[in-house]
């Protein structure tokens, strides 16, 4: 009976296999998509999309400040078209998608939802987990785009949107 105490489902994790995931992210959307399809073909049921430092710091790939860093430690994301290319996936095999973007997360969240909808995929069909790590950047990484009070407001706005519009996430 709701509210469940061990999971979001009545039988907890006993009713389903664990979601197998692996972190990946490099290059552009097409390259990430090829790697993601390969991982799904190998039996993974979840994907963790990591973005490059240019993206997580709010830079476009053509900015001179990030020359040599684009696509190295994650996928470069400059536009909705990048995510559309990345999401050329067999979504029927995918149960879980994590998007790690931190400070630009509000924009990334909107782009992920828009790219899924353009692909004809209902975001409610699987679990989307976003890493909304504003404080991680401020306290652990030592770089940040927003001061903590503004970053927390933006992060809680994302949480409120998800609670209202995508409660199964």
Question: How should each PLM-predicted stretch be described?
Answer:
Residues 1-169:
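Catalytic alpha/beta active-site cores
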